[in-house]
């Protein structure tokens, strides 16, 4: 016998809201039962944050519809930009009604000192403080708007653990796929101003959404055919204007309005492209024995790496570990205490920075895109009107003359992308590029970077983003320890599962047990260096494996061409060229097989 349906703890019914003449919600229904953890997904500008505010009963009121909260239920909302008040973090965390001991435990879970001043916090500290306060209040419903922004990977994992342990229902807006995959069991899709519901976690969402979009596209094609037929009917003359055909004419006008609505949504699709600035040298960056300290704190010690043309290198580590510092060291923008850094030839660097430092609040969007003045921007070598280019990044004409201060976090990020992508580049550096981006823009950015034929250095906390893009990952533990492994975040953790364990006690984020009443013990000694191949050897091993796999087909094709008895007499130049290519392919295969055997033997010896 099926279990009875539970009454929702928070619900919306037939909610409608318009932004001026533009409808935002048109009959939205949403119900959240106790202890259900769900995500709210939707494209840029769909109104996800607005809907959370309506659910929270804070700041936005619907034009019509109902909001129902279970009697006695406590709803807590954490916005994208929480404001921290009070003298200390404990003052802030108890302001919502939590007891001191509850607030202290929650702050400790997120690695925060209750006595720390509430002023001058970093973005990550602000976010952790807001989350700690929310959990300390023990809500029945938790509404989270982009909760992983500015958090490092370890703080995100703590948030995942807190959600799993909590008895509250939760509705989450986030672009972080790995996070949503781990914490959600239901998806609400805000699309076409209504809500569609999937009673499965986010891991099932994208396949489900694609099937719905395919069905919608087929329905749109059917409606277009009907509209074409009805337009022809109306064009035949006055018959279409007679009273007895008024119903048919109204239906035609409704079809036209629906098509116009669909077209306006399609126009809200962002486009991106990037052009290489020409080929850089094969060696992009070579660092040897690099050491950097700030006072007594070591960022990196005796670190060496080589970044080659086409590499996609991710940098990960706790907030404050020195990832941005290492980027500046590798680019030669910061003096080293020891070691050398050599940059390759013909480098054109494009840098999108974490703190959005390139954006001045005093200028407008137009001014930022045209630093030299005028009404045109040079895009990949050709002039383009700034208004047209801005529209490709979803900026309206009205926004062009607005100050940067009026932009949301996601809009600021898009503005930086717009300017950076206008210039040809062969070395792109992105420092936390996924903050504030919606999933559609994030997908587009991933596609762009995957097709980019230059070199990429990426600082990110987004595990899924790293796994999809990175060819290698450099991890910093915050105490000078650095490890580099092929692949993304998952590969890093598979190969170095204990790397960060010894470091947490000394980094900016150090979670503490709720039961802890004494200071945390000193961190254990850093683990011994893993007995594995060096990064260079591992990279060469993989290159050899790839060459061994593809060479037989190449050799067979060349041998087939040479089997033509008339090739030499018909085209001696092609015969010679093919023969040389065959000799080279055979020699390369033999060399790769020899190196592979040597490296595999070395790997076995290291493993003991």
Curated annotation (Swiss-Prot):
One of the GO BP terms on file: DNA repair
Subcellular location per the Swiss-Prot or TrEMBL entry: Cytoplasm
EC number, UniProt record: 3.6.1.-
GO cellular component, one term: cytoplasm
Residues annotated to bind ATP 2: 317-324
Enzymatic class: hydrolase
InterPro entries tied to this protein: AAA+_ATPase (IPR003593), ABC_tran_C (IPR032524), ABC_transporter-like_ATP-bd (IPR003439), ABC_transporter-like_CS (IPR017871), ABCF_ATPase (IPR051309), P-loop_NTPase (IPR027417), Uup (IPR043686), Val-tRNA_synth_C_sf (IPR037118)
Residues given in the record as ATP 1 binding sites: 42-49
PANTHER family, sorted: ABC TRANSPORTER ATP-BINDING SUBUNIT, ABC TRANSPORTER DOMAIN-CONTAINING PROTEIN
An MF annotation (GO) of this entry: ATP hydrolysis activity
The protein's name: ATP-binding protein Uup
Pfam family, one: ABC_tran
Function (record text): Probably plays a role in ribosome assembly or function. May be involved in resolution of branched DNA intermediates that result from template switching in postreplication gaps. Binds DNA and has ATPase activity. One of a cluster of genes involved in attachment of the holdfast to the cell. The holdfast is a structure that allows the bacteria to firmly adhere to surfaces.
Alphabetized UniProt keyword annotations: ATP-binding, Cytoplasm, DNA damage, DNA repair, DNA-binding, Hydrolase, Nucleotide-binding, Repeat
Family listed: Belongs to the ABC transporter superfamily. ABCF family. Uup subfamily.
Main location: cytoplasm
Domain comment as written in the entry: The C-terminal domain (CTD) helps bind DNA.
Domain ABC transporter: 7-217, 285-512
C-terminal domain (CTD), binds DNA, as annotated region: 522-608
